[in-house]
Amino acid sequence: MRVHHPYHEIPVETLNVDFFNLSPLSVARRLIGCAVVRVLAGERLSGRIVETEAYGGLRDPSCYVVRRDERIWSLLSGPPGVLYLHRAYRHWLLNITCDAVGEPACVLIRALEPTGGEERMRQLRRGARDLTNGPARLVEALAIDSAWEASALPRAEFWLEAGEPVPEEQVLNTVRIGLTRGKDLPWRFAVRDSPWVSRSVEAVLSEASLSAGL
């Protein structure tokens, strides 16, 4: 969907339900290189997505907790392109539902490369050195409101935009981070050599090898 936003001189392609109506693995990969945009008090804050993780409820062992929560399970099984703000270790994490209705799935936005409004982001992060290289950090840097949960994209103050496609050779595919179940599934995507990813591929692979006893 191409729309005019007041912060653009030319039309941009804003991601909507059609983009997210695919499997979580497809959406997680396609989101690499896209932009996250937040308008805060008239200022545009933005970042290029450099890291994502896919979660597919029915066949994903890591989703054992949300299966017990009827509200979350219903949200993940509903229409694609809807915000799901997951809370972990007292921090909010940004997820977007995907796949067809009835197929519980989402994609976690793990890291961004800032492209606009960096000074304001640093204020929101209270001067922290690590700005958006982690799922909780980017939520804080963009002042994403947990009250937005269950609302469809795009919102007036928050949306995603298509970006330049990132070639396959520049995208790494690894296991996900910090899981106790489903940790062997290669459902994480990250831009190779990006200083903004939350964990280097070497660290992730080393951790996976140790947990496997290799």
From Swiss-Prot:
GO terms for biological process: base-excision repair. InterPro entries: Formyl_transferase-like_C_sf, MPG, MPG_sf. GO terms for molecular function: alkylbase DNA N-glycosylase activity; DNA binding. Its EC number is 3.2.2.-. The keyword DNA repair applies. Keywords: DNA damage, DNA repair, Hydrolase. Coiled coil: none annotated. Belongs to the DNA glycosylase MPG family. This is Putative 3-methyladenine DNA glycosylase. It comes from Gloeobacter violaceus (strain ATCC 29082 / PCC 7421). The lineage of its organism: Bacteria, Bacillati, Cyanobacteriota, Cyanophyceae, Gloeobacterales.
